[in-house]
């Protein structure tokens, strides 16, 4: 919905009817929303991508390329997202089932069942770069967000800056994100997503041609109102900042508060205080139904250091009360208090282990 959604067909309808769409052009949404097309474009301009294939005709072709890439690998839908249309395959015997399942799932969810193969990288982090691009050709990068803490390929907690990012890797990844935006003729707000390997190598995985759920943590450390700039850029206002003007200050964390059940919110207490806020539409007596995304809101904290931000988030989670609907607040507390998180030594597969340990 709104700024958090992307639909090339809707953007095109706006263009055809003289309505200014706040976002990139429809053809850019189409191109970058297709993982195969965007992957090929990145290869052409020299942005590193994960080893993989183009769209595959059938299972037999997939088996042939799988032998070249090596197992484990991913079967990915070109139109996939949010964990849909993606399967991990550890051996050839499972490839056919994964191929058909991912294709059917993507066809049902996105109307496009095309799939391709990609090497499955282990012990990686999911790091994304926030960009703003105006209609005059200026592009800014507002730094990274570490979104590695995921359950079922759904983000649970995000932080910025990434606790493992060096200045050298950050600069290279920012340059790659700007290069990706230029190659796509991108305008407005967007996010370029990468996998970061333990050896410091990073690989483009996709570009989100919209505002991300987790954008507020970037706003906190950069002082840039991303949504305001989305509207200004759509009105052809040029960016009034240069890259060297962007000063990233402090550390910000976002915890997604999700419903674990349906029901009526009988009591609600939202934490307050300086540099703490809860983005939500939730109110007392709100009825949570099963038809939509389970996220109830985003708890965001900002502090001078990562350690202080962790303490502030822990206190805020302890203060938050939602009665009548089961939530993941206790799981978020468990995560924030874990030694693995506090050391910053985590990857995309670690959350299951943290929650199982208790």
Give the location of each predicted region.
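A conserved helix-loop-beta module that forms one wall/lid of the active-site cleft
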Residues: 15-78, 85, 262
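ATP-dependent carboxylate activation and anion-phosphoryl transfer catalytic cores
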Residues: 4, 8, 15, 19, ...
């Amino acid at each position: 919905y709104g700024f958090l959604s992307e639909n090339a067909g809707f953007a095109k309808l706006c263009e055809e009817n003289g309505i200014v769409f706040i976002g990139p052009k429809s053809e850019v949404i189409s191109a970058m929303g297709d993982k195969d097309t965007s992957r090929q474009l990145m290869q052409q301009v020299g942005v590193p991508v994960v080893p993989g294939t183009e769209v595959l005709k059938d299972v037999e072709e997939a088996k042939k390329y799988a032998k070249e890439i090596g197992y484990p690998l991913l079967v990915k839908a070109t139109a996939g997202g949010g964990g849909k249309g993606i399967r991990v395959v550890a051996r050839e015997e499972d490839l056919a089932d994964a191929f058909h399942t991912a294709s059917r799932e993507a066809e049902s969810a996105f109307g496009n069942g095309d799939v391709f193969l990609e090497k499955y990288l282990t012990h990686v982090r999911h790091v994304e770069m926030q960009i703003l691009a105006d209609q005059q050709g200026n592009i800014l990068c507002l730094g990274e967000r570490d979104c590695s803490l995921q359950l079922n390929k759904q983000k649970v907690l995000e932080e910025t800056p990434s606790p493992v990012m060096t200045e050298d890797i950050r600069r290279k990844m920012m340059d790659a994100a700007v290069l990706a935006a230029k190659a796509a003729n991108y305008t407005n707000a967007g996010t370029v997503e990468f996998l970061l390997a333990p050896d410091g190598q990073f690989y483009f995985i996709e570009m989100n041609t919209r505002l991300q759920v987790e954008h507020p943590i970037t706003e906190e450390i950069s002082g840039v109102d991303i949504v305001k700039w989305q509207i200004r850029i759509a009105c052809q206002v040029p960016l009034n900042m240069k890259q060297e003007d962007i000063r990233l200050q402090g550390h910000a964390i976002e915890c997604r508060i999700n419903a674990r059940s349906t029901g009526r919110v009988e009591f609600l207490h939202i934490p307050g205080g300086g540099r703490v806020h809860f983005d939500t539409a939730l109110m007392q007596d709100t009825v949570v139904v099963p038809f939509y995304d389970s996220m109830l809101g985003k708890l965001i904290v900002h502090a001078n250091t990562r350690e202080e931000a962790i303490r502030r988030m822990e206190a805020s989670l302890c203060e938050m009360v939602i009665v009548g609907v089961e939530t993941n607040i206790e799981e978020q507390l468990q995560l924030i208090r874990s030694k693995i998180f506090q050391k910053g030594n985590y990857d995309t597969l670690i959350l299951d282990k943290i929650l199982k340990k208790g």
